Each structure stands twice: as C-alpha cells, then as structure tokens.
Design a protein with these regions (language model features):
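Catalytic micro-motifs at enzyme active sites that drive phosphoryl/nucleotidyl and oxygen chemistry
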Residues: 97, 162-165
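Catalytic cofactor-binding cores of redox enzymes
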Residues: 1-144, 169
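Short, low-complexity, polar/charged sequence segments that are solvent-exposed and flexible
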Residues: 127-130, 151-154, 181
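Acidic, Ser/Thr-rich peripheral helices and adjacent loops at domain boundaries
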Residues: 148-163
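Conserved small/polar residues in nucleotide/adenosyl-binding loops
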Residues: 178-184
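Substrate-binding cleft of carbohydrate-active enzyme catalytic domains
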Residues: 173-176
Length: 188
C-alpha cells in the first residue's frame, strides 16, 4: 500500500484511516501477547484483514466510520482476551506497593508490557545475583502472583515509556525493550 495515498487524502478520510491503523497497531500487540500465552480469538484475527482492507480502499466517511467503531469494539474484545491469558497464566493480580529505589548491585530494567518476556527474563536471571526492575507499562507485573514470587523482581525504575530517552540515558544497566520503544540519542 502506498502510504502517500493516506497522508495526502482529505483530512477527515486521513483521520479516520489513521484511527483504524493506530487502533489495529495496538490491538496487534495485545493479540500477539495473548497468542504467546496460547490464547487467540478468530473474530479478532479476522478483523485485522477487514480493517487493513478498509485503509487500502477509496471509501468515504460513511463507510470508514463503522470500521473505526468496530476497531474500538474489537480492541475491547482483544484486551479481555489478553486479561484472560495473563490471569490464567500468572494469577489474578492484586494491589501491591512497589519500591521505587534501586538497590546496589547489577540490575536489568525491562520496559514495555509483554509479561511473557518478563517471565523469561526472571527465569533466566534467577539465582544469578541480578535484580530486575520494571519500567513504564510493565509496572502492573508486580501484582501477578506468578511474577512477584521472584525475589529478584525488586521494584520499578522511572516513569512512563515516553520518558525512556531521559531516564535510560545514564543508567549503569542494560534495558530490555519488550514494546513501546523510543530511539536512543545515539539512534536519533
């Protein structure tokens, strides 16, 4: 698809198609996370094709607006699927107090919202003397019983994903990006 067709389209059409693209993009991340845990929904999966097809067509607002609304409906369904996948895999989360200080010693920061990647990192670093700190959207991981049982999941570092460049600039540790990455200063 020639994206210039979208970017040069009339403002309302461009806006509706952008809503579809950005909504499907986020939904794809949630669907992928659920799929990594063995959960999928065929209705959600089929909708990806329908939504992307709509972006490629020369449709007016009357045809695109229902697709935009359906993006919201399918996103809600996809979030419910991911919630089911996460709770059935990692347990029902409960509110917890999460330390915001970093202990002395080696550590890794993990950012994004892929709990499966966090679980793999926790398994690989268990007993190695390396502490793990969440960042941004990974913060809720501390509430899941199957994740908080790891003693080296120590706390949360920093704030939200859009502050990655500033917050990661001088930390003496590697960062594992699972999603929502901004280019570092060296990449800009």
């Amino acid at each position: 698809y020639d994206m210039n067709l979208l970017w040069n389209a009339e403002e309302d059409i461009r806006s509706l198609k952008s809503l579809i693209l950005f909504g499907v993009r986020g939904m794809a991340a949630y669907a992928h996370h659920a799929m990594m845990l063995g959960y999928a929904d065929e209705e959600v999966n089929r909708f990806f094709a329908k939504a992307l097809f709509a972006v490629g067509e020369d449709w007016g607002m009357d045809a695109l607006l229902p697709i935009v609304m359906e993006v919201g409906e399918k996103n809600l369904k996809c979030m419910a699927l991911l919630d089911k996948a996460n709770t059935e895999t990692y347990g029902t989360p409960t509110p917890v107090t999460v330390p915001l200080t970093v202990e002395k010693g080696p550590f890794i920061v993990i950012t994004g919202h892929d709990l499966h990647d966090l679980k793999l990192l926790l398994e690989q670093t268990e007993g190695k003397g390396v502490n793990i700190y969440t960042h941004g959207e990974m913060l809720p991981a501390h509430g899941y019983p199957e994740l908080k049982k790891y003693a080296h999941l120590k706390g949360n570092f920093g704030t939200a994903w859009q502050n990655q460049q500033r917050e990661f600039a001088d930390i003496p540790a590697p960062v594992s990006y699972t999603h929502l990455t901004l280019p570092t200063k060296l990449e800009v």
